């Protein structure tokens, strides 16, 4: 059986988990409410502030789904209680970002500013013009948004200009010499 799937998910105080028909799980907390439909190969049980996921049979797929479901449920519980944060850095002359409500204005060297509309549940802060802090309860959506913003101008390998994750290392190349 999956090693991750065997571990129970500890539910902190202030967080409730409801399992509806069709394996639709809803997690409510102080920061948000998240819901997700899981595979029917797994069964959820919640008792005494602990949630456990068990595969319905011993097939390879059911065991794999139990580990996946446990990891996703753990992220949902952490998201509604603490929330997640992703930091992006912008490197380059004239490259800037500015958060305005649910939009992010990016100046990335194009002939026009890029306006990225943030999805519901994700907020952006720009403490400095070259820093973006994305916050949200849904880890999957937060990663998707950060990836889409990075896609506008990926870090290039010669000068390192572009949008990168805060902890990302960009291997630099040496320019060709004549």
Curated annotation (Swiss-Prot):
HAMAP family, alphabetized: Ribosomal_uL6_B (MF_01365_B)
Family: Belongs to the universal ribosomal protein uL6 family.
Keywords: Ribonucleoprotein, Ribosomal protein, RNA-binding, rRNA-binding
Domain of life: Bacteria
InterPro entries: Ribosomal_uL6-like (IPR000702), Ribosomal_uL6-like_a/b-dom_sf (IPR036789), Ribosomal_uL6_a/b-dom (IPR020040), Ribosomal_uL6_bac-type (IPR019906), Ribosomal_uL6_CS (IPR002358)
Subunit-level organization: Part of the 50S ribosomal subunit.
GO cellular component, one term: cytosolic large ribosomal subunit
Name this polypeptide is given: Large ribosomal subunit protein uL6
Its job: This protein binds to the 23S rRNA, and is important in its secondary structure. It is located near the subunit interface in the base of the L7/L12 stalk, and near the tRNA binding site of the peptidyltransferase center.
GO BP term, pick one: cytoplasmic translation
Listed Gene3D superfamilies: Ribosomal protein L6, alpha-beta domain
GO MF: rRNA binding; structural constituent of ribosome
PROSITE patterns to which the protein is assigned, alphabetical: RIBOSOMAL_L6_1 (PS00525)
